[in-house]
Amino acid sequence: MAKQQIGVIGMAVMGRNLALNMERNQYTVSIFNRSLDITEKIILNNPNKNLFPFFSIKDFVLSLIVPRCIVLMIKSGVATDDTIKSLIPYLSKGDIIIDGGNTFYKDTIQRGYELLKIGVNLIGAGFSGGEKGALYGPSIMPGGRQEAYNYVSPILKKIASNSEGIPCVTYIGPDGSGHYVKMVHNGIEYGDMQLIAESYFILKTLLRLDNQSISKIFDIWNQGELNSYLIDITKDILIKKDDQNNYLIDCILDEGSSKGTGTWTTKSALDLNEPLTLITESVFFRYLSSLKSQRLLASKILCGPKDFFIVLNRDDFIEKIRQALYLGKIISYAQGFSQLNSASQKYNWNLKLGEISRIFQSGCIIRAKLLKNITQEYSSNNNFVNLLLTPYFREIANTYHSSLREIVSISVKYGIPIPALSSAISYFDSYRSAFLPSNLIQAQRDFFGAHTYKRIDKSGIFHTNWYS
């Protein structure tokens, strides 16, 4: 019996669509799912395709060409550990496991270390693009041993999305680097979504625009600098109606939820001493929004501004919102890529940030016109420390910061919560400041804890007896 070229474990929507993507690209695919009825249903719904179902792990593994390539599209954590343990008795030296879940990068490092003891390679690969991306072409971020990647790269390039004819996949680096990049990708996604939500809220509350009008504004924005997947879907979300002819957006509970990757990103930023302020505020906002019962109580007890906003030039104000959103987006990406650079140095990953920005240009959730500018800046100079310091982005920042400042000021004056936008201008002002009040903080630390300080006029470390 002929053996299959690749195997996929996990037939939820991502695994199923990835298997169909592989099959469409002329690969024979073995599939396995813990719930057997799901496997049977997939075969029933996809007749005459090179999908081969198996109902035991042993039969599944033995159905594959050696060295085997097995893709895991399952829930991260215990489920991944259990699945790998079930595979081990039937694997051979040189086999490759690709973990395509949203796995914590340190778990990937540990699993890769343990598997390498028995000669099995682990590739931790981030897959972005959602269920549609999995089917028609995701952005793929594989990390692990270079030789393992070289073996599986032909199939990854076949199934990946492409930008200007080049597949949106590249070798990220060793061990957990692929999952780390996917984690930061998701953090940037949090920031993007929060900035868009705040812009929508300003248009809705301050300008009192209806959903149709806001959708048209987002459609116009999507034709220019802000062109992106998230802006594109937002314009459609705003005008979607339910079966009662109500705008669906107005019927959705305002409690943000998450799966934890944003939290991982912010925790890593703290470990690296990276000021990931905008993305962190976006994570915190989801936590705050989930306090619905408390917010309802507070809305009856705590007072806010009573003034009624009157705009003199609506089109001019909308343009300022657009500029504020774009600069906020730039700052979010600047923080995310700065964190990638810090992680690369700490873990010796040698991340190629220009290549990473390139593979984000198609297939993934954060794909945006902006990424072409990022790639271009890295191709011109790969040694800069922050996107805001590069020619294109500093020109935008120096032009748009006044709009961001005005939108934040007006929103605060009228009681509109905008944590991401306000974080953006705060970061911008802090980053461009040659002097910050941290001198006082250092003096306070030395006063109560003898933590010492440095001076600007003398070299060395100093401590003062503040009580004398």
Swiss-Prot record:
Q: Which GO terms describe its biological process?
A: D-gluconate metabolic process; organic acid catabolic process; pentose-phosphate shunt
Q: Residues that bind substrate, according to the entry?
A: 102, 128-130, 185-186, 190, 259, 286, 445, 451
Q: Which keywords fit this entry according to its UniProt record?
A: Gluconate utilization, NADP, Oxidoreductase, Pentose shunt
Where in the sequence is the active site? 182, 189
Has UniProt tagged this entry with the keyword Oxidoreductase? yes
InterPro entries attached here?
Answer: 6-PGluconate_DH-like_C_sf, 6PGD_dom2, 6PGDH_C, 6PGDH_Gnd/GntZ, 6PGDH_NADP-bd, 6PGdom_BS, NAD(P)-bd_dom_sf, Pgluconate_DH
Binding of NADP(+), residues = 10-15, 33-35, 74-76, 102
Q: Which domain of life is it from?
A: Bacteria
Known EC number: 1.1.1.44
Pathway(s) the chain acts in? Carbohydrate degradation; pentose phosphate pathway; D-ribulose 5-phosphate from D-glucose 6-phosphate (oxidative stage): step 3/3
Molecular function (Gene Ontology), one example: phosphogluconate dehydrogenase (decarboxylating) activity
Q: Does the keyword NADP apply?
A: yes
What catalytic activity is recorded?
6-phospho-D-gluconate + NADP(+) = D-ribulose 5-phosphate + CO2 + NADPH
Cite the record's note on assembly: Homodimer.
Q: Could you tell me what this protein does?
A: Catalyzes the oxidative decarboxylation of 6-phosphogluconate to ribulose 5-phosphate and CO(2), with concomitant reduction of NADP to NADPH.
The UniProt family comment states:
Belongs to the 6-phosphogluconate dehydrogenase family.
Recorded protein name is 6-phosphogluconate dehydrogenase, decarboxylating
Organismal lineage: Bacteria, Pseudomonadati, Pseudomonadota, Gammaproteobacteria, Enterobacterales
